[in-house]
Amino acid sequence: ALRQHLLRLQQYTKKDMIYLARGGFWSTAPFIFSSVLSIALVWAFANLLPKDIYGTYKFVMTLSGSLSFLTLTGINIAVTQAAARGYEGVLPYALKIQLRWNVLFTIAMFGVAGYYFIHNNALIGTAVCILAVTFPLTTSFNTYGAYLFGKKQFRQIAGYQIFTSFFYIAAMVSILAVTDNLLFIITVYALGSLTPLLFFYYRTLQLSGEQSQFLAEQKAQFLNYLKHLSVMNIFSTLSQYVDKIVEIRREIVNRDK
């Protein structure tokens, strides 16, 4: 019955409504799954972690997010577009330029860590160093999802994202259940996020078969679009995090008085 309704609607929209319905379902399923699992993570943070440790955790994560504009934030959209155009070699090329460019983020984060070490706050300094190394890798290897989206592999993306969410949340709830050590928690956060992305990135490459050459003209189009998107994202990223940093920093200062 649903198929008949979609076919009837297709006569008016002139679009493949069955395809759109399938894509919509597989796009929504990971969001619903991760939202349900996130309830367990929220509960764990609220009940298993002291407020002062949680406040410091939020501060470190917000610091990392505020500098994320130094990564190529527009690359996933650019990769999706390139994959949709049939540029098969875009995935390894995108990883390569991200690993190079994201060094800026690592340098900036080490600078922030140095500030905290100088001011005798080794805890935050060490936590920032952990994210300085792992966050750029996470943002680089998650590009496989954008590639699969451009190739319209919605079911495959959904399966990968659901497993990734489960792996990360299970790891976080487990570490929160056994310790309130901030550095252990940050490390598990980093590895819990990165590990499944590494696996699914290389699996995507393997299943995609031999990658065709990414031609110079294709690279030029890709890079121009990528630069435009990334520059546009700088201001939105800064505006999103500046107020949060000030607010959380104020909470920490007031707590330590």
Where are these regions (language model features)?
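Interhelical loop/hinge segments that connect adjacent transmembrane helices in multipass membrane
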Residues: L2-D16, L20, R155, G159, ...
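Signature of the first transmembrane helix
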Residues: D16-N76, F110, S165, I169, ...
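Membrane-interface helix-loop junctions in multi-pass transport and translocation proteins
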Residues: A46-Y54, Y115-T126, K151-R155, F166-L197, ...
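Alpha-helical transmembrane segments of multi-pass membrane proteins
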Residues: S66-L70, V103-I107, N121-Y144, A158, ...
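Residue-level recognition of transmembrane alpha-helices
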Residues: S27, F31, K58-M61, Q98, ...
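Alpha-helical transmembrane segments of multi-pass membrane transport and lipid-handling proteins
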Residues: A1-L2, I32, T71-T73, L95-N120, ...
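Transmembrane-helix boundary and interhelical linker motifs in polytopic inner-membrane proteins
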Residues: T13-I18, L49-I53, L67-R100, F149-R155
